[in-house]
Design a protein with these regions (language model features):
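Short alpha-helical segments enriched in small residues
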Residues: 1-164
């Protein structure tokens, strides 16, 4: 296990335990991380008490089917803070969760399906009881797609920790 993976797994262990203690629930709508955030949340025993469900919406069509407004994707692009925010809000509504994460972006190479694709550009948002947070990050070059996903999940973990 790499140091990156070890650190990210520890962050999510802390998050899941804290959510259990605080009796808070969480959900995700993930694109570029392919469900890794939800998966990491469930690696700690008792996660079923906090993870209400999750969506992997890898395509634009999947996002729209889960109530991300097509108009937002058309106006701002699928890779935008606005789309990430709508993903978080749609997931939050779907599961009535206390915290919801939406994440979209391009990892190591250009997405031929979307003109606004820039490798390493990731957008995520967190909707919670007090409001919303959205971020745009540039992911450094990594050796594998898994490492890209881990890196992004780690950044998201830091933001989740800040809103719990």
């Amino acid at each position: 296990m790499t140091e990156l993976e070890k650190n990210v797994r520890e962050k999510f262990r802390f998050i899941t335990k804290t959510l259990i203690e605080k009796k808070l629930t969480i959900t995700t709508m993930e694109s570029c991380t392919s469900g890794l955030v939800a998966s990491l949340l469930t690696d700690t025993e008792g996660a079923s008490a906090v993870l209400k469900g999750a969506f992997i919406t890898y395509s634009n069509e999947a996002k729209i089917k889960q109530n991300v407004p097509a108009e937002v994707i058309e106006k701002f692009g699928v890779y935008s803070e606005e789309t990430a925010l709508e993903m978080a809000l749609a997931a939050k509504r779907a599961y009535s969760a206390d915290i919801a994460v939406g994440v979209t972006g391009t990892m190591g190479n250009v997405d031929p399906s979307n003109n606004d694709s820039v490798p390493g550009e990731v957008f995520f948002a967190i909707a919670h009881k007090e409001g919303t947070v959205s971020r745009h990050i540039t992911v450094p070059v990594m050796d594998s797609r898994y490492e890209y996903k881990l890196y992004v999940a780690g950044v998201i973990a830091d933001e989740i920790t800040g809103v719990m």
